[in-house]
């Protein structure tokens, strides 16, 4: 088995007519038998990456090879076969059929793959026993706890013995006892030739991982001194869809704030002159930059951490930062 190899992956989509890149140039090698944690807040690209790995979303460029097959090139019957035979997905909201019992839910992918009813039933029974739900086989989702429903979802995901397991926020909405049950189960799946990729914002899962991929940069120290940046006319200070940890105040010259459009063009949002600031939303809410900023002329900007900028502005409320109050004089 060749494991998982991601090379220079770029995912781009249109949001309100603008081009958004939640993933931009990602590369990653994962050995068979590994558990990979994708860590980051909402909106950082975790679910987008899972969708690409599952063959649900096609990237703009780059490649994803699993077991030495580039899944970004698969189409039609070959893509359907990959999704059915190679991938198992555990959804955040369980996605169980409420009218079916736990046993019947696990049988669904088996029957869809052409497995006989008797063989599907035996396989589903074995899997539910494996996830410690042997006595809950006849229970419907509404009669089960969140942790139990999640274990049914895991059993269903591995019904066809896929070599790639994708889990999206598997501990969301679970109490600490249910979380423990699910964590043990997920760790047990990453054995042999199987690769397990889990998207989460839950740092409690980190000790389980063989590999952790943070889809946002580590936050800088709040005590980091201001950073003065000098740029020539036409040079880019930061690009749309990238992550950042500094809020910038213009001290000299002018900057253009532009948004890249889905058709490849761009739209001028505003021109920032001395005393103006920008980049606060991404920093405060841990979101990718929503626009590209480049120097309209030779210019200078000073970058502040969120805490330092609050002090610079003379406010404590986030709302005051977003509403662009006048800067306090130094």
Curated annotation (Swiss-Prot):
Transport keyword on record: yes
An individual GO BP term: transmembrane transport
Residues annotated to bind a nucleoside 3',5'-cyclic phosphate: 210-330
SUPFAM superfamilies: cAMP-binding domain-like, P-loop containing nucleoside triphosphate hydrolases
Single GO term (MF): ATP binding
Pfam families registered for this protein in UniProt: ABC_tran (PF00005), cNMP_binding (PF00027)
Positions contributing to ATP binding: 40-47
Ranges for domain ABC transporter: 4-242
Keyword ATP-binding: yes
PANTHER family: IMPORT ATP-BINDING PROTEIN, LIPOPROTEIN-RELEASING SYSTEM ATP-BINDING PROTEIN LOLD
Protein name: Uncharacterized ABC transporter ATP-binding protein Rv2564
Source organism of this protein record: Mycobacterium tuberculosis (strain ATCC 25618 / H37Rv)
